[in-house]
Amino acid sequence: MRNVTPFKGWRSVGLVLLGWLLVCLAGCGPRTPAPLGQALPVSASLAGLWRVQADDVGGIRAQVLNVEVSNGEFATLQWQPEAAEGLPSVRAYVRQLGAQQLLFVETGDAQKGYYFAALTSVSDHEIVLTAPNEKRLKKASKALGGKLKYQSHWLHREAHLDSGLLEKILEQKSGELFTDGIRIRLQKVVR
């Protein structure tokens, strides 16, 4: 069984999603060893600079993210130099799981994994992501016979669950899982 970690707080994202976008965008989504679901292409029109803002998250207010798309399979994300000192670039993948489109972003840390958020809306000029609501994740996990385990870190606490359980939750309860989750808005910077 693989371990999956819901990341609590997009606060770390700014420090890490960035240590990391979504410890990278790291901050608000379950951690999984690999992206789940059917691969979807990443449009080349998404390449460029994006201003990132998140509701109730002090760490990633109005930060700028450079997005590169080379082959349509993934996007490479890199925070702009003033916000990215020492942070590696990471890859982001778009997946379809059930009715839900998800963005998986590499954690960029030594534990290797991915954080995820739901793609609420996508256009060439604006992307809105919603992080999973941890209370709803815990409730859904319990309803399906699973249990979240917590690991504390310096700035946050992560919940862990195996990827099989996460997949069941996403297939059966994805509508509930993202209700009241932190919203992350990316707006394209026009030069």
Label each PLM-derived region with a short phrase.
Residues 29-45, 53-64, 72-191:
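Calycin-type beta-barrel ligand-binding domains and close structural analogs
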Residues 2-17:
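Bacterial N-terminal signal peptides that target proteins for export
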Residues 24-27:
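C-terminal motif of bacterial Sec signal peptides marking the signal peptidase cleavage site
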